[in-house]
Amino acid sequence: VRPNPTAQNVMDGAKLAKENCCDFVISLGGGSVMDCGKCIALMMTNDGDLWDYSLSKQGGKKIPQNPAAPNICITTSAGTGSEVNAAAIISRDDLEEKTLFLRPSMYPTISIVDSDLMLSVPPK
């Protein structure tokens, strides 16, 4: 997952998860990875394109019919808070949009903060 994940990152991940009959997502990384994982979990259980559910200017403004799949967030960075909230920031380069996705079912099912995974993170 690249920094500032894209809708295409999400759709690729959701497609892979569906093709392999995955039941849940494990998001191991920083805020971008966890945001992408939350939206992958949402699209694993809902039809269409992620932007169908975007409230942005060019989004479809649809309400997801199903809750997101379970998502285990394991943070490797400090300060994003993505492991404890239901929000995700996703970009769509072709529309030049970057927007918030926020659904109660996108709260991580389990969040893990392991200090051993953050030994290389700068203190500030």
Give the residues covered by each predicted segment.
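N-terminal small/polar loop signature for handling phosphorylated ligands or for N-terminal nucleophile
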Residues: 1-49
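A glycine/threonine-rich phosphate-anchoring loop and its flanking beta-alpha core
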Residues: 47-124
